[in-house]
A protein has these predicted regions:
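Positively charged n-region of N-terminal signal peptides that target proteins for export
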Residues: 1-4
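Short, conserved beta-strand segments of beta-strand-rich sandwich/propeller modules, principally
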Residues: 123-125
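Bacterial signal peptide processing site
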Residues: 17-19
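C-terminal motif of bacterial Sec signal peptides marking the signal peptidase cleavage site
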Residues: 12-15
Length: 147
């Protein structure tokens, strides 16, 4: 009888425990895509994915370790697919020059091509150049996933 009572108490005790916590997906944070250049680093901060019709926002951070960096120069959006790559949009962005520390510039793309037509779901690339005070040019690019 004692064993039965102990078993019942044990079952009641263990069944009153809380349920395991519900697992949720972690929030999607921004991605920082670093590129090393001859005299420092360029970071491009983007979202993991964008929604069709949403204005694309990317932050470009120039961080020279010596000398200066200037950019983004000649920025454009290109589409990549089975048939190769194609320039979708040339962007008008005022470049910045950084001599010490770091500085940022925000890039906005309204998901339209050069003729003003809205574009759809695809993998796009933000491509631009940076130049250092020695005249060395580095091309930087990052993928923008639009779904």
């Amino acid at each position: 009888m004692r064993r039965l009572a102990a078993l019942i108490v044990l079952l009641v005790f263990t069944s009153c425990g809380s349920a395991p916590p519900v697992r949720t997906s972690p929030p999607v944070s921004d991605l920082v895509i670093p590129t090393t250049v001859p005299n420092g680093k360029v970071d491009v901060v983007v979202k993991a994915t964008y929604t069709v019709g949403e204005t694309i926002r990317a932050t470009i951070r120039l961080s020279p370790t010596t000398g200066t960096l200037r950019g983004p120069l000649d920025p454009f959006i290109q589409a990549s697919g089975f048939h190769g790559t194609a320039t979708v949009r040339h962007l008008a962005i005022d470049p910045i020059s950084v001599g010490a520390g770091s500085a940022e510039v925000v890039v906005l793309w309204d998901m339209r091509d050069d003729s003003g037509t809205a574009v759809g779901s695809d993998d796009y690339s933000l491509v631009f150049n940076v130049i250092d005070d020695s005249g060395r040019t580095t091309t930087v690019g990052t993928t923008l996933q639009v779904r």
